[in-house]
UniProtKB/Swiss-Prot annotation:
Keyword Repressor: yes
Gene: rde-10
Highest rank taxon of the organism: Eukaryota
Keyword Ion transport listed: no
Compositional bias (Basic and acidic residues): 7-16, 467-478, 526-537
UniProt KW keywords: Repressor, RNA-mediated gene silencing, Translation regulation
Species for this entry: Caenorhabditis elegans
Knockout consequences: Insensitive to RNAi-mediated gene silencing.
Disulfide partners: none
Protein name: RNA interference defective protein 10
Length: 627
């Protein structure tokens, strides 16, 4: 009986998706499809699977001369091309069929039971093949590093161009629903409800002193130098316009002293654009003070959308994230629960207004026309409206116009230009309230918007491949590389089942698994850890029932190990796990204080799963790109 339970626990790894490997070609069903080792089945249909079964496999066999192999990357690329080239009418037919099926809960449950029963029958009908597959699967897992995979929201990784587009699209749809509801609630009021004085919006701009993507840890590092918040409405224009400089805490931002010199050229390039020192502004405020100021302004208008320039979206997003991380746990919570759901590019918000609000033109501007207008940079903010900070007011061009207050003014001027060009009902242009900048197309010194660049998914895949090649040069029994950034990625492919849905298809065929779902940061994370020892928004004597999931980290020669008592929230009664299989790891490695904090029950659950699956094995504990 105990042996049966032990075997049963081997199948209970669906909670740890990283341990879900693919299937072997030796064990197949009677129809030629592989038998999956995964227990989970889904009763829903997907457009891709309908296409694959009804059209894709036959077309592939006819044109390529052999059967489609889902484990062959070349075959997957060809099938992806077939799928995207599908006839629109046929795709709509599949979509209707999928919507009709998935919308019927009873039918979904019935299909799920039927598929589970079929899988059980196949396993009992071919017990030898299935046991062979299971043994091969367990052998593969035993040869790879085991991983505790904590869930992470992909929305927190926006340096990938495709992920940023998806994030902006999701928040745009949310803003559209909110505006539709607002207009419906004010339908009995006379005039355009968007022209009320209580309908306010806020623009936030950030210019960083340090901004760089680090492929080794799959993170964007952005430390703000200046931040500005502009509150306005459609009737009165600018209501409030403030900015702050941020003190550059190099010791906190660069845990290793060598990094300061490595990124000096990058910081100098960014600082020169803003006219400040690479070591940050001389009279900047403390980062936690700036975040508290920002939080105060945003709380004054809790229902207002938070707008920013799409071209500098990551300047704003990661800059505020850095301030929240520096400030403390409550600041992180405010960032996650208030700022992330509300932040939206001003270009997308303008499109939402033109789509939902009444206009006096037969056809409103398209998205591309709106984006082109916001790229117009031959604008000089009016001096009498206090649209420059005191530092940049007397600076020469082009440094003067990189001031974040001036950038907000130029964004707002283009916003009103679009509203005026589409003749929003009830909107009356009133200079200088709605014409806050002077157009001067002859001034070639006016700078264009500095872009917060992102990387495509293909480039990210290349970086990951390079890192994996570097990792393979070092054996785990050796002391390890001299540069601790060379221990980075750990992931396993998902099991692509016959009945998987379209989302799993996208993970398998369109993008690498490690970038789409569980892209893992290694122990050598050099993004600033949360300064819990000096947290500004948490009482220092508060003790929390928590367990730290440690991650191995190479000691910097300039620093001694930090004692665990330095962090009030970081303690554990378990023995630290090592990334190295030897019983006596090198003394050059330490366990960092802060990694990923779970409550004790959740931590015990993960450790119990690991102990039951592979008792006595050493595990490499890692964490995701999250707070």
């Amino acid at each position: 009986m105990s042996n049966h339970r032990s075997n049963f626990r081997d199948y209970q790894r669906e909670g740890i998706r990283a341990n879900n490997a693919g299937t072997s070609g030796d064990a197949v069903r009677q129809n030629g499809n592989p038998i999956s080792v995964a227990k989970h089945v889904d009763g829903k249909k997907s457009v891709y699977m309908l296409f694959l079964r009804q059209i894709g496999q036959k077309k592939f066999l006819t044109e390529q001369g052999h059967r489609y192999n889902q484990n062959d990357q070349a075959d997957k690329d060809i099938m992806t091309r077939y799928y995207h080239g599908m006839c629109p009418d046929l795709k709509q037919k599949f979509e209707r069929e999928v919507a009709e099926h998935n919308g019927n809960r009873g039918l979904v449950i019935k299909t799920k039971h039927q598929r589970a029963q079929r899988n059980r029958e196949m396993r009992h009908r071919n017990p030898d093949e299935f046991q062979q597959l299971r043994r091969a699967h367990l052998e593969t897992l035993s040869q790879t590093p085991s991983v505790i995979a904590l869930p992470r929201d992909i929305n927190h990784v926006l340096h990938i161009t495709e992920d940023l587009d998806a994030f902006c699209l999701a928040n745009r749809k949310k803003a559209k629903r909110i505006m539709t509801s607002y207009i419906a609630q004010r339908s009995d009021d006379p005039g355009n409800p968007l022209l009320c004085e209580d309908y306010t919006m806020q623009i936030v701009s950030v210019f960083p002193v340090a901004y760089a993507f680090k492929p080794s840890i799959n993170k964007l590092s952005s430390y703000p130098a200046e931040i500005s918040v502009t509150t306005f409405n459609l009737k009165n224009g600018i209501i409030q316009n403030e900015s702050r400089f941020v003190k550059f805490d190099a010791a906190w931002f660069y845990p290793d002293a060598d990094d300061i010199g490595h990124e000096e050229l990058s910081r100098k390039a960014m600082a020169d654009e803003l006219g400040i020192s690479p070591n940050g502004p001389a009279d900047g405020c403390e980062p936690y003070e700036v975040f508290e100021w920002l939080q105060h302004l945003l709380k004054q208008h809790p229902k207002s959308p938070i707008l920013c320039d799409r071209a500098q979206f990551n300047f704003v997003y990661y800059g505020i994230k850095t301030l929240a991380t520096y400030t403390g746990i409550n600041a992180i919570t405010f960032f996650q629960e208030v700022i992330i759901p509300s932040i939206l590019s001003i270009q997308d918000f303008t499109s939402v207004i033109l789509e939902k609000a009444p206009t006096d033109v037969p056809r409103v501007w398209r998205d591309v026309d709106i984006c082109n207008q916001f790229q117009y940079h031959f604008l000089i903010p009016r001096t009498e409206l206090n649209l420059f900070c005191s530092f940049h007011e007397n600076k020469p061009s082009p440094t003067k116009y990189n001031c974040v207050k001036a950038h907000n003014a130029r964004l707002l001027d283009n916003f009103f230009t679009v509203i005026k060009g589409n003749r929003l009902q009830g909107f009356v242009i009133s200079p200088p309230v709605h014409e806050i900048c002077i157009q001067d197309g002859s001034d070639t010194s006016l700078p264009q918007t500095i872009l917060a660049r992102t990387i495509s998914r293909n480039d990210a895949e290349v970086y990951a491949a390079r890192q994996r090649d570097t990792d393979e040069q070092y054996d785990v029994h050796q002391e390890g590389p001299s540069n601790h950034d060379q221990y980075e990625f750990a992931s396993e492919p998902l099991d692509f089942e016959e009945d998987s849905d379209e989302e799993n298809y996208n993970e398998q065929l369109d993008v690498p698994y490690s970038y789409n779902d569980h892209f893992i940061s290694s122990s050598s994370v050099r993004e600033p850890e949360h300064p819990s020892a000096r947290s500004r928004d948490v009482a220092p004597n508060v003790q929390q029932e928590s367990v730290v999931v440690p991650a191995p980290r190479r000691l910097s020669p300039q620093r001694a190990p930090r004692p665990s008592q330095n962090s009030p929230n970081a303690y554990s009664e378990r023995k630290s796990f090592s990334a190295f299989p030897s019983e006596d790891p090198s003394e050059d490695y330490e366990t960092p204080i802060i990694s990923h904090i779970m409550n004790r029950n959740e931590a015990d659950q993960y450790f119990n799963i690991l102990d039951s699956v592979k008792p006595g094995q050493k595990y490499k504990i890692i964490k995701f790109d999250d707070f």
